[in-house]
Amino acid sequence: MEAKAVARNIRIASRKVRLVVDLIRGKQVGEALAILKHTPKAASPVVEKLLKSAIANAEHNYEMDPNSLVVGKVFVDQGPTLKRFRPRAMGRASRIHKRTSHITVVLNEK
């Protein structure tokens, strides 16, 4: 049985979120939460909140034991890009891409 949680349109570039997500793939849930707690990246509180949501989904919806959960699949997809302009010298402007990401966490029982 799998329990899943998805966070969409997170305002952090997917390349940066993947650095955090790669740390917890395949780990037990308690260990993954400890790793995220001590990771000094902007994406780690977001991934930690999503992992807690997946644990709650497993407990409530599927009646799984939270102590026997393992992070099965975790992946980050690119979301829509917000396009903005930054004023530059001599009346010009350059385009800025504010990237978003979709994060998915799937938990399995050990």
UniProtKB/Swiss-Prot annotation:
The keyword Ribonucleoprotein applies. Gene3D superfamilies: Ribosomal protein L22/L17 (3.90.470.10). GO terms for biological process: translation. Keywords: Ribonucleoprotein, Ribosomal protein, RNA-binding, rRNA-binding. One of its GO terms (cellular component) is cytosolic large ribosomal subunit. This protein binds specifically to 23S rRNA; its binding is stimulated by other ribosomal proteins, e.g. L4, L17, and L20. It is important during the early stages of 50S assembly. It makes multiple contacts with different domains of the 23S rRNA in the assembled 50S subunit and ribosome. The globular domain of the protein is located near the polypeptide exit tunnel on the outside of the subunit, while an extended beta-hairpin is found that lines the wall of the exit tunnel in the center of the 70S ribosome. Belongs to the universal ribosomal protein uL22 family. Part of the 50S ribosomal subunit. This is Large ribosomal subunit protein uL22.
